[in-house]
Amino acid sequence: MSLTTALTYALPHRLLSSMARSLAYSDDPRVSRWLIDTVTRKFNVNLDEAANPDPRSYATFNQFFTRALKPGARVADADPRSLVMPADGRISQLGKIEAGRIFQAKGQSFTAAELLGSDEDAKPYNDGLYATVYLSPRDYHRVHMPWTGTLRETVHVPGRLFSVGPAAVNGVPRLFARNERLVCHFDTSFGPMVSVMVGALLVSGVETVWSGEEIPHYGDRITRKDYRGQGIRLERFAEMARFNYGSTVIVLLPPGVADFAPQLGAESPVQLGQALAKLR
């Protein structure tokens, strides 16, 4: 085990994330301005794309971090059969779910059942596709719908808060199946679809457009919320959630319905709205 990986295990994840939350929501201008200036400078954040490009106009760091984009900054792929990329960021991995397993890095993998919280939830995705998108601190931090879907259920799976940066992904086995996460099940025109919002070190929260804040969740049991019959329908490319700091979203598709865009591969930089896959 490398020193970096050992430190990843040793860090007080919950304490650090709680502290990050307090700072992110602080309306003390000395705190918010210092954080905004530091992150903008260190990660070369492009505020020209923001609906509000003035960094001094944000009352808190969290407002800055979850900023909206100006109209037209991102557009959905023109092909109406394209599933679109759910976020800005970088492809961590993508491919076929083989023998129920999802590849993570360097020969490491985890099962779809571990990720989703049950064998039953994973069955529709056997031999299907997965795409893991990492959002760095410089990226736009709202997550959108790859395809039009009606929300059926969410599943909160408690867990750790390991970093999801490259060093941790390469060094911590089954990382995405161990971190706290929110699994969002949708019914679509081609069948079921899942978007998994993975929590991480320093992520102070995950919010959805239908329920508000979902993470942090202070229970230690898997929690399910049934949304059937509520008619929560989100269109392709519509916002569905946001991270209150950088993290990862994983999309699962059932077998035989789509093929990934050929230019995509591990480490590909991606933008919200570009083609993720095309329906067959």
Swiss-Prot record:
GO CC terms, sorted: plasma membrane
Subcellular location: Cell membrane
Enzyme Commission no: 4.1.1.65
The entry's keywords: Cell membrane, Decarboxylase, Lipid biosynthesis, Lipid metabolism, Lyase, Membrane, Phospholipid biosynthesis, Phospholipid metabolism, Pyruvate, Zymogen
Cofactor: record remark: Binds 1 pyruvoyl group covalently per subunit.
Modified residues (Pyruvic acid (Ser)): S247
GO biological process: phosphatidylethanolamine biosynthetic process
Top EC group: lyase
Post-translational modifications reported in the UniProt record: Is synthesized initially as an inactive proenzyme. Formation of the active enzyme involves a self-maturation process in which the active site pyruvoyl group is generated from an internal serine residue via an autocatalytic post-translational modification. Two non-identical subunits are generated from the proenzyme in this reaction, and the pyruvate is formed at the N-terminus of the alpha chain, which is derived from the carboxyl end of the proenzyme.
Positions marked as site (Cleavage (non-hydrolytic)): G246, S247
Pfam family, one: PS_Dcarbxylase
Topology of this chain in the membrane: Peripheral membrane protein
Catalytic-site annotation from UniProt: D88 (charge relay system), H144 (charge relay system), S247 (charge relay system), S247 (schiff-base intermediate with substrate)
Catalytic reaction annotation: a 1,2-diacyl-sn-glycero-3-phospho-L-serine + H(+) = a 1,2-diacyl-sn-glycero-3-phosphoethanolamine + CO2
Pathway annotation: Phospholipid metabolism; phosphatidylethanolamine biosynthesis; phosphatidylethanolamine from CDP-diacylglycerol: step 2/2
Requisite cofactors: pyruvate
Molecular functions (GO terms): phosphatidylserine decarboxylase activity
Function (record text): Catalyzes the formation of phosphatidylethanolamine (PtdEtn) from phosphatidylserine (PtdSer).
Subunit composition and interactions: Heterodimer of a large membrane-associated beta subunit and a small pyruvoyl-containing alpha subunit.
Family: Belongs to the phosphatidylserine decarboxylase family. PSD-B subfamily. Prokaryotic type I sub-subfamily.
Name of the molecule in the record: Phosphatidylserine decarboxylase proenzyme
Protein source organism: Stenotrophomonas maltophilia (strain K279a)
Phylogenetic placement of the source organism: Bacteria, Pseudomonadati, Pseudomonadota, Gammaproteobacteria, Lysobacterales
